[in-house]
Amino acid sequence: MATNPIEEIIGSTDIYLLDQIMKGRYKMNDTILDAGCGYGRNLHWFLRNNFVLYGIDQDVHAIHDLQRRHPLIANRFFPSAVEKMLFEDAQFNHIISSAVLHFAKDTAHFRQMIAEMVRVLKPSGSLFIRMTSDIGIEDKVRLVGEGVYEIPDGSRRFLLTRRLLEDLKRENELTFLEPLKTVNVDDVRCMSTVVVTR
């Protein structure tokens, strides 16, 4: 059976992260952290191109799977919560957080995760965030907890709002590297992509 040559190169990397790759955001010798890496969906291209890559996730099974599949760099993957990372200040050139932050328990938890990622990000480094938001479906979501909403697809998620994003930029001295992008999936869910620097 023939394999898909594109999949061999990019794996199942998020399309908006591919956009950043294609724009040359990530340079050889950059140190990259995937904060909430899971089983490594977004790591394929970076691993294939020998980037200095680290990954954390609370799912111990996912981390063990990554360590097994990548034994030469197994010590760069370990279980950790995003809000309690053991890295040094300003350790990474880039941080990726894709489909992670909408699992925040509340706004305080979300702010802790953002602050911790900013802490370990080098000055002028990039922070890539992809998460659910209310942008475009503000009148279709129902608040069920502090920052947590029930969205039209029936799930409950912490949602990024325009106001919260502006607050976070101000509090953490972040600026946009790219315009905010939001995809509306048939008015049942919206996913926003934020790329910022400190």
Task: Place the predicted regions along the sequence by residue.
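A short glycine-rich, Lys/Arg-flanked "PGG" loop and its adjoining helix->strand segment in the class I
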Residues: 111-123
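Short conserved loop adjoining the S-adenosyl-L-methionine
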Residues: 84-89
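Class I (Rossmann-like) S-adenosyl-L-methionine-dependent methyltransferase catalytic domain
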Residues: 1-83, 126-198
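A conserved beta-strand element that flanks and buttresses the S-adenosyl-L-methionine
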Residues: 96
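Flexible, active-site-proximal loop/turn residues at the rims of small-molecule/cofactor binding pockets
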Residues: 101, 113, 133
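Non-membrane alpha-helical structural segments and their capping/turn regions in soluble enzymes
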Residues: 60, 107-111
